[in-house]
Amino acid sequence: RHKDFWQITEDSLDKSMQAFNINKAMKNELLDLYKILSPYPEVKETLEKLKEKRYKLAILSNGTPALLNELVKSNGLQNLFDDIFSIEEVKIYKPSSKVYDMPVKKYSIKNEEVAFLSANTWDVSGGGNYGFTSIWVNRNKNIFDNLDYKPKNEISGLNQLIDIL
């Protein structure tokens, strides 16, 4: 049975609040924090430069369409993305190939033509194993998890993407 990301987040929060004896009245306040995430300082400028170079920009996320659209709009980024792909279209989470198929099919492109960025090592590995050109956004100089895949590139900020592409 499929549950969307928001429901899983709520369920996990309920269990965590119970385990740590956190007042249930705080639940909505804590959930609302997901809706006010802000991008890093260089993100908007980098996306604008990529759009000027005519790159197609998209989000591919386990998040729900409602949450993703709200975050993009609240940060003034809605005109910078060509698409927002949510796993809700296929009702299965990454790293299922059905998720990664979405942009490949929509744009009729080869897997390796997709530059797939993430700060999560498991996410980079999933996209890379699918055949995407994976780029790990490693802002904190972390060590890549011991997974069966290593990213094609590693950057510490999105602005470095301009030189890679």
Regions inferred by a protein language model and the residue ranges of each:
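A metal-dependent, Asp-based hydrolase signature
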Residues: 1-28
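Asp-based, Mg2+/Mn2+-dependent phosphohydrolase catalytic module
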Residues: 24, 48, 60, 64-65, ...
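Surface-exposed cleft-lining segments at the edges of enzyme active sites
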Residues: 28-36
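Transmembrane alpha-helical core positions of polytopic small-molecule transporters
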Residues: 36-37, 93
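Catalytic-core regions built around general acid/base machinery
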Residues: 42-54
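Short phosphate-binding/catalytic loops that engage adenosine nucleotides
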Residues: 54-55, 132
